[in-house]
A protein has these predicted regions:
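Enriched for short, Lys/Arg-rich terminal
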Residues: 1-4, 15, 19-22, 58-63, ...
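PIN-domain endoribonuclease scaffold, especially VapC-family toxins
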Residues: 5, 26-30
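Basic, amphipathic "hinge/linker" alpha-helix immediately C-terminal to the N-terminal HTH DNA-binding motif
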Residues: 6-10
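Short, solvent-exposed positions on alpha-helices
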Residues: 23-26, 44
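A short, surface-exposed loop/turn module that caps and links secondary-structure elements
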Residues: 30-56
Length: 91
């Protein structure tokens, strides 16, 4: 299983989400466990200029942006937001 690294921007979002919507945070945790246990699954890459990042839809309206480092066996979570806003994110 790969290790998990959550960037400060995503951590701030998850802390706020734990107070407002803990059910959705549980769904995110379950998806992250799935990603960490099966990182060879073909998760979609984003388009340019974010082409090095992967994405996965959570629930129906939200997107999680992450990267998988196969050399160091680390999944890094960068951002999470509504699908209308998430693609405007600048790393």
């Amino acid at each position: 299983m790969y290790n998990l690294d959550i960037k400060p921007e995503a951590d701030k979002i998850f802390r706020r989400l734990s107070k407002k919507n803990p059910k959705q945070l549980g769904i995110i945790d379950k998806k992250l466990l799935d990603i960490r246990s099966n990182p060879s699954h073909e998760y979609k890459f984003l388009r340019s200029p974010l082409q090095t990042y992967n994405r996965v839809h959570i629930d129906t309206h939200f997107v999680l942006i992450f990267k998988i480092d196969h050399e160091n066996k680390v999944v890094t979570v960068y951002y999470y937001d509504h699908h209308d806003k998430v693609y405007d994110w600048k790393p």
